[in-house]
């Protein structure tokens, strides 16, 4: 086993990478509230795992979506647990994200030279809210349907571009199959990809600049 490790160590310098990760300086003022961002990341990873598991059974059509969710909850092995964990971790992710934003703001973590870290964090907060909006509609029950209808109808108040924007969100002039397909694609592919990219940027900047000092 040691020969295998030595072979990889010689080529990749694994020990040097591990030392760099574990030897990062942590300021003495850091407390449990500085862990909120990491907890948010953990919730996101749980979301990815449980969401991926549900894609094996969920059917993104207006005629089968609700029935497929019922199947997950009542027939699929541990489906009820997987969906419940998905919902609980979604709520936890939103809560931890809000608390994290407040902590950073109140401790001045957005100030120079960490402005870009703050910007990427705000973008991640918007993406988190978008997860909630798109995921809420996927069961395609009465609550989900009317939530989509209201949310996609909001931009109509914008002059000139309002109506085209509503049609772009819905995929047609009314809420239907095209809308569900769009929201499913956003929820399972576009938003996770964007979130992963901005999280990588966010954590890379934190690693580079370190944790902000006390007020």
Swiss-Prot record:
| Localization of this protein | Plastid, Chloroplast thylakoid membrane
Its record classes its membrane topology as: Multi-pass membrane protein
Would you name any one GO CC term?
chloroplast thylakoid membrane
* CDD domains hit by this protein: Cytochrome_b_N (cd00284)
Q: Any idea which positions bind heme b 2?
A: 86, 187
In its UniProt record, a GO molecular function of this protein is: oxidoreductase activity
Cofactor binding note: Binds 2 heme b groups non-covalently with two histidine residues as axial ligands.
Which sequence ranges are marked TM in the entry?
Answer: 32-52, 90-110, 116-136, 186-206
Q: What is its main location?
A: plastid
* One GO term (biological process): respiratory electron transport chain
Which cofactors go with this protein? heme b; heme c
Which residues make up the binding site for heme c?
A: 35
The answer on whether this UniProt entry bears the keyword Transmembrane helix reads yes
In this chain, heme b 1 is annotated as bound at: 100, 202
This protein's record includes keyword Membrane: yes
| Complexes and interactors | The 4 large subunits of the cytochrome b6-f complex are cytochrome b6, subunit IV (17 kDa polypeptide, PetD), cytochrome f and the Rieske protein, while the 4 small subunits are PetG, PetL, PetM and PetN. The complex functions as a dimer.
The family assignment reads: Belongs to the cytochrome b family. PetB subfamily.
Q: What else is known?
A: Heme 1 (or BH or b566) is high-potential and absorbs at about 566 nm, and heme 2 (or BL or b562) is low-potential and absorbs at about 562 nm.
Name recorded for this polypeptide = Cytochrome b6
- Organism, by scientific name, is Piper cenocladum
Q: Identify the gene encoding this protein.
A: petB
